[in-house]
């Protein structure tokens, strides 16, 4: 079952992300703020009362037509079932219901995070959109003490023709 995250989910989300290498783990406090402030653009996947997946996103303040997918974490035993894809689609539909006109999805990935790169490439192929990839952040900018990989930015711009819909209606996703 998909549902919005809440403040009470912070510790469980933190634990899940800690088990999903190579994701950077943030503080439980950060995940509490996600549940408080970004529940419209984020989602958790729950089975039998346990959080088995989370997609955390936000609308960019200076480009609110763009959904930035910040973290995708799916429990190891639940991977390969399309949960991440369905979660992103559920977020898009939720944002549309709330009156947002999303024109692109953005995300970053490190070269070692092949699953993340594969997810966004698969979405681009399925939605028949041409994605754009560019080197975004040098690793040295992200850590003063230990090595951090560079971050690549992938953008999936939508077009009504590519999605087969009028405007930003994501009903066919």
Swiss-Prot record:
N-acetyltransferase domain location: 1-148
Cysteines paired by S-S bonds: none
SUPFAM superfamilies, A to Z: Acyl-CoA N-acyltransferases (Nat)
Pathway the protein takes part in: Amine and polyamine biosynthesis; ectoine biosynthesis; L-ectoine from L-aspartate 4-semialdehyde: step 2/3
Keywords: Acyltransferase, Transferase
Key word Acyltransferase present: yes
E.C. number(s) listed in UniProt: 2.3.1.178
NCBIfam families: ectoine_EctA
Family the UniProt entry places it in: Belongs to the acetyltransferase family. EctA subfamily.
Protein's name in the database: L-2,4-diaminobutyric acid acetyltransferase
Gene: ectA
